[in-house]
Amino acid sequence: MSNEIKPVCVIQGPVASRSGYGDHTKAICEDMIKWDKFDVKIIPMRWGVCPNTMLDDESRPMVKEVKSRIINNLSVQPELFIQVAIPNEFKPIGKYNVGVTAGIESTIPKPEWIEGLNRMNLNIVPSAFAKEVFVGASYEKRHDNGAVEKISLNKPIEVVFEGVDTGTYKKTNQPYPAMDSAMEAIPESFCYLFVGHWIQGDLGADRKDVGMLVKVFSEVFKNSKNTPALILKTSGATFSHMDKAEILKKIHDIRFPLTGKLPNIYLIHGETTPEELNRLYNHPKVKAHVSFTHGEGFGRPLLEATLSGKPLLTSGWSGHVDFLPAGLANLLPGTLGKVPPSACNDWLVKEAQWFNVDYSVAARRLEDLFVNYIQYIPNAEKLRQQNDEKYNLEAAGKLLVETLNRHLPAFEKKVTITLPKFKKIEAPIVPPATSP
């Protein structure tokens, strides 16, 4: 009698991290477990200094199941290895290797990223933009012996979007005491909301362009009798008191040179549960969402925001335009420009370009949305319905499975053999022969 053993799939990524990569890793783990084709094991990784608290609440669906699959090291080579990371970290550990990355927020990836993608058998990115940038990248690498090697992507790459939990992120009037209590301190009845990290870079050079959002908003609505407010749900890389103080200082330094009576800007800093964040998206005082982002590999917070059914004003370039069609979304025009030196890091290189919003147009759109708000509601509701149907977790999981099925080889089948049990037969004791 024999039993077939499932091939082993090891997923390595920041499954417990409070980050976009953490959300993505956790969703992939859940999809692979539900598929039930593999014996899924998970190797957790850190993601910078982001809090590792994603799996703390075991009452959430699948959390216990995900935690039960966590291992500390590999004892055998897995048939399938899925790594969720930036491409230069990709390592082909399995018999078949899949690299998953949010991709790129600018026009040029580092050569090391293309080399990393080429180490894997298959690569998955969340947007058409990310795929286009990687496919179009080409470099020449000069070796010590003088030989020149052309580097370009030579492995398959597929688009599988990041799904959103539409059971949590949805249009709702349900109160949430913790968030409602924080919002009581805001007197304005019309607030714009930004959600995202405020990371390195001078004014106009942080990737989400939060600094210029603060400046433009302050200038548009200064000295007005009836003014909206801007809520920033943001942080640097941590939720520490020092981080909060630094964010407040940035806001002050941007607004201090401006004259006149400025509109209020409020900071919500610290960790929130998905339910609290969804309540913020849906709070009656939050009327619209806004982001001047320079570029997104996908832009999950923007997708979440659309599910509130409220207008979204954002940049018209990069990964998020997949789920923000021009006919329904309010996309801001702009131009491509060099990534500033203060923004360059391990993945944003000085040779690359990103998107700069036309701030004069953005200013007019902010004002028009405030004055003519009702006119923006129908398209926002249509976009909510469309994204709820197309970009949920189930649809993303289905696409992931379909994509893997197209590419995965037939792994060698392993079986365990159970031998039948036999009764122990005692041999008769024969006395030793004696010599005559």
Predicted regions, residues:
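N-terminal pre-catalytic "stem/leader" segment of glycosyltransferase-like enzymes
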Residues: 1-78, 229, 398, 403, ...
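C-terminal amphipathic helix plus adjacent low-complexity
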Residues: 2, 344-436
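Extended catalytic core of nucleotide-activated donor transferases of GT-like folds
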Residues: 3, 10-12, 49-133
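Conserved catalytic-core segment of nucleotide-activated headgroup transferases in glycan assembly
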Residues: 24-26, 30-31, 166-279
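Donor nucleotide-sugar binding/catalytic pocket of nucleotide-sugar-dependent glycosyltransferases
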Residues: 122-178
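Acidic donor-binding loop of glycosyltransferase active sites
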Residues: 279-297, 307-310
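Short glycine/serine-rich donor-binding loops of glycosyltransferases
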Residues: 299-302, 317
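Short hydrophobic beta-strand element within catalytic cores of glycosyltransferases
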Residues: 311-314, 330-331
